[in-house]
């Protein structure tokens, strides 16, 4: 597994820094899958599992993977003009409907026979491009969706279920929005792994559980507040609750630190509070899990994701969205170290086993099927 991680990091350096694109091989029997991608860490996290398992795909299903930055595709500067069986593409979340359609048509003109998948890496659960893309794609891939698919037909204040909740909670004036799902779209909607399956987290999950009996920090919660009005008020409320604990608990909540120091703090923390961001699923959720810090987070039971890492009372501690039970649960789990470690260990081992057993290779089969890339057993 370590070799696959280093291959990914070398790939990132070659594509991002050197601007070199590796052509597909000339082996006629191999199928070809091309990822057209945006340049952002969250975007790259969505495709990492595929490139991590690239050799498995070649061996088990006989197809190759290549990555083409979206900017290079738009400029027609790439070596992928030949036949391609599947194209998976990303865009930024604020692309206009007309621009998205133009891009989709360009992909179709370039590879007329390819099956197309859209990779929605966006933080919120909404499916804003479903209706636009439905006639053109074989699959719509996202790292989290609402468990109740019927909720997608409900109008929201703002763009998402989170903007809706916090606009109502804080009395904010946001326009009503509805991203209706086309009939039958649910069959195209597929899940991809969340942030746990990334090159900077995976190595930690492959190590033994980081048990530490004498963690010195009671609560870790470095919370950024600046952002859009609903986000700022939501995060400020969370920060204020954490700051109230400073007089009686040892808390890390103020300012920014580098990644190494940040992880060092988490390895030394009993509890980690991870409020929502612009979406529910956050990097911090899994950083808490691989450091053995017990995750406290607003209730995630409304979401689907895989691996299914948010199991109430088993892999994390759910909080009310208004955080009315925050102080009570902080006090309880600080006073019950055995229960705290049990839940933290469960979370770590659930993800560790997912990676060790290479379950992604099974979970991805519905997507491969839709793209015509699966080799029949």
Regions found by a protein language model. Give the residues of each.
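Nucleotide-sugar donor-binding catalytic core of glycosyltransferases
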Residues: 6, 13-283, 297-309
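Catalytic binding pocket for nucleotide-activated donors in carbohydrate/polymer assembly enzymes
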Residues: 264-376
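Boundary detector for helix-to-coil junctions that initiate low-complexity/charged tails
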Residues: 1-7
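Generic surface-pattern signal
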Residues: 10, 15, 59, 109, ...
């Amino acid at each position: 597994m370590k070799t696959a991680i280093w291959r990914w990091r070398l790939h990132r350096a070659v594509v991002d820094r050197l601007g070199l694109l590796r052509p597909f091989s000339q082996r006629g029997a191999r199928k070809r899958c091309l990822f057209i991608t945006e340049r952002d860490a969250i975007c790259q996290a969505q495709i990492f599992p595929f490139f991590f398992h690239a050799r498995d795909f070649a061996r088990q299903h006989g197809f190759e993977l290549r990555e083409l930055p979206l900017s290079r595709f738009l400029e027609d500067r790439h070596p992928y003009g030949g036949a391609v069986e599947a194209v998976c593409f990303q865009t930024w979340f604020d692309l206009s409907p007309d621009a998205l359609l133009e891009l989709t048509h360009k992909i179709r003109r370039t590879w007329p026979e390819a099956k197309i998948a859209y990779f929605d890496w966006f933080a919120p659960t909404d499916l804003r491009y479903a209706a636009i893309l439905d006639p053109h794609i074989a699959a719509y891939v996202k790292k989290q969706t609402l468990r109740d698919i019927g909720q997608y037909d409900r109008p929201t204040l703002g763009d998402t279920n989170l903007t809706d909740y916090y606009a109502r909670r804080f009395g904010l004036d946001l326009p009503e929005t509805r991203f209706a799902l086309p009939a039958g779209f649910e069959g195209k909607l597929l899940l991809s792994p969340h942030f746990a399956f990334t090159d900077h987290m995976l190595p930690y999950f492959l190590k033994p559980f980081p048990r530490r009996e004498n963690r010195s920090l009671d609560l870790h919660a470095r919370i950024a507040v600046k952002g859009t009005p609903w986000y700022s008020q939501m995060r400020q409320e969370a920060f204020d609750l954490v700051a109230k604990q400073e007089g009686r608990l040892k808390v890390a909540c103020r300012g920014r630190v580098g990644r190494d120091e940040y992880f060092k703090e988490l390895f030394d923390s009993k509890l980690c509070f991870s409020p929502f961001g612009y979406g529910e699923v956050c990097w911090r959720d899994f950083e808490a899990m691989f450091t053995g810090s017990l995750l406290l987070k607003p209730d995630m039971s409304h979401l689907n994701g895989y691996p299914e890492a948010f199991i109430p009372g088993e892999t994390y501690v759910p909080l009310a969205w208004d955080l009315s039970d925050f102080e009570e649960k902080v006090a309880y789990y600080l006073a019950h170290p055995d229960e705290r470690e049990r839940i933290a260990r469960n979370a770590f081992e659930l993800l560790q086993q997912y990676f060790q057993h290479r379950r992604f290779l099974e979970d991805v089969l519905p997507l491969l099927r839709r793209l015509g890339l699966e080799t029949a057993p």
